[in-house]
Amino acid sequence: MSVLQLPEGESADFSQGEVYFIGNATTLIRFGGITILTDPAFLHKGQHVDLGHGIWAQRMVEPACQVADLPPVDLIVLSHYHGDHFDPVAARDLDKDLPVISTYDAVGKLGPLGFGHGYPLDTWDSHLVEKGEARLKITAMPGLHASDDATAALLMPVNGHLLDFSRGDQHLYRLYITGDTMLHDRLKDIARFYPDIDLGLIHTGGTTMLVTVITMTGEQGVRAVEITRPRTAIPIHYNDFSVFMSGLDDFKKAAEASSADTEVRYLAHGETYTFTTKG
């Protein structure tokens, strides 16, 4: 397993961390002195993004901040290289020396844009990040961007990611990000190989390209929660673009009917979820 060594910063807080919801699948995750930016997309409301295959989507909700508003970021964790997950603003304004952990496909496409520090992961592969006492193990989780083989072949590969935070050898917190996956059988392997997930960030929205749904609906997102069994779940990626056909209300309705023990929390753009750890 390769190791990314980050410069040690100021004294880190290992008692709690936070997830700041910027919009779509863009979050800022901070714990133990490590700051992670996920799926950076900063287009303004009303602007359009190219999703490929001649399909464009309009941004419907303004992101909570812009790149210039961010604190210092240590690395980017990217589900895949679609325009609503790494948009032209991110490509233009983000520091191109930032490490990017993603699929082989995404890392290959970001290189020509100047992002030369890519760390590609296949499913179940891991990369270790160290910063002072903090250790972050990032493992690629299985993702499937479409339920039928023909559509999946047209779309790019997608990863979920498991973030295991530790202080030295003491494991403190486990966070799962679904990425833009559909429901599929390999999600059951996540619960089997990686139980005790503390927090799940669940990509929903029912993204529809032409007539094909390529991300989970709200109801399917709740089913993913039931399968992976995080202690707490937060739905994201639910209302930002015109191709989303399943809003947050669909998730809420299904969550109310679910018998899962998971606590569900809801974040609007610009809100923060603070979590406490075992350490």
Where are each of the predicted segments found?
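Divalent metal-coordination and catalytic microenvironments
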Residues: I29, D39, H80, D87, ...
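Active-site metal-binding loops of divalent metal-dependent hydrolases
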Residues: P40-F42, Y81, M141-L144, G179-T181, ...
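Structural motif
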Residues: I34-I36, D74-L75, P99, L136, ...
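Pre-active-site segment of Zn-dependent metallo-hydrolases
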Residues: L6-S11, I34-L78, P88-D93, A146-A152, ...
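Active-site-proximal beta-strand elements of phosphoester/diester hydrolases
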Residues: E18-F21, T35-D39, L136-G143, R174-D180
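Short, hydrophobic beta-strand segments that form beta-sheet elements in well-ordered domains
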Residues: E18-F21, P99-T103
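Metallo-beta-lactamase
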Residues: S2-F14, D69, S102-Y173, E256-E271, ...
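Cap/insert and terminal regions of metallo-dependent hydrolase folds
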Residues: R59, P99, D105-G108, T181-E271
